[in-house]
Amino acid sequence: MSEFTVYPAIDIRNGKCVRLIQGDYEKETIYGHSPLEMASRFAEEGASWIHLVDLDGAREGKKVNGGHVISIADKLDVKVQVGGGIRTEKDVYDYLSQGVERVILGSSAVSNTEFVKKMLKAYGGHIAIGLDARDGFVSTEGWLETSSVRAEELGRELANEGAEVFIFTDIATDGMLSGPNINSTVELARATGKQVIASGGVSSLADLEALASRASEGVSGAIVGKALYTNQFTVAEALERVAAK
């Protein structure tokens, strides 16, 4: 059986855990725990990875909440992947040299493809490519801009440059608890021949099970956010369900 990983998500804005709906900064819910407390809770429930997003960084195009990210990577026995505002080689190096396992390059994949190719060459599997799509086209700058580049085309190009892991978000489903876009996730995995982590829309254990059932086709994991925060299920329940696949 192909391995399938559950990635509990923590979105950080102004140093707090928040959730946005469809990436809209006006539609924000703040949760009471600090990012470290929330990550600790997820780790205690059995998470092996934590997915972190520096929302301020994504919007401003530079690292803003890096201290919180490093703290989680340093203090907890989990692997951390982080995205948001990572635009320079120093940003990448700083995270990877301080315990972060994987850095996600998103907007740069469109706006500065040469930089991404250089990072793939230097850091290989420690780089994940974040492809966030609206109607099949890659969206950038914290989802504020939509490009004319198709997700599958960019994915194929970067896979040829050494990308091993992609994170695919269908913006229409993000934070909506409406179910993930499984078909588009599988299509990206087929187009690239690489691992694709699904993000956005997971609302139930059944959604996770449906994604995990496609692991042999390249769907290697799912990022879960709002469903955990609204108590649809726990990390422990999620891990139990996908382990049964």
From Swiss-Prot:
Its EC number is 5.3.1.16. GO terms for molecular function: 1-(5-phosphoribosyl)-5-[(5-phosphoribosylamino)methylideneamino]imidazole-4-carboxamide isomerase activity. It catalyses: 1-(5-phospho-beta-D-ribosyl)-5-[(5-phospho-beta-D-ribosylamino)methylideneamino]imidazole-4-carboxamide = 5-[(5-phospho-1-deoxy-D-ribulos-1-ylimino)methylamino]-1-(5-phospho-beta-D-ribosyl)imidazole-4-carboxamide. SUPFAM superfamilies: Ribulose-phoshate binding barrel. It is found in: Cytoplasm. InterPro entries: Aldolase_TIM, His_biosynth, HisA_bact_arch, Isoase_HisA-like, Isoase_HisA-like_bact, RibuloseP-bd_barrel. It comes from the Bacteria. GO terms for biological process: L-histidine biosynthetic process; L-tryptophan biosynthetic process. The keyword Amino-acid biosynthesis applies. The active site is at D11 (proton acceptor), D132 (proton donor). Transmembrane segments: none annotated. Pathway: Amino-acid biosynthesis; L-histidine biosynthesis; L-histidine from 5-phospho-alpha-D-ribose 1-diphosphate: step 4/9. GO terms for cellular component: cytoplasm. Keywords: Amino-acid biosynthesis, Cytoplasm, Histidine biosynthesis, Isomerase. Its main location: cytoplasm. Belongs to the HisA/HisF family. NCBIfam families: 1-(5-phosphoribosyl)-5-[(5-phosphoribosylamino)methylideneamino]imidazole-4-carboxamide isomerase. This is 1-(5-phosphoribosyl)-5-[(5-phosphoribosylamino)methylideneamino] imidazole-4-carboxamide isomerase.
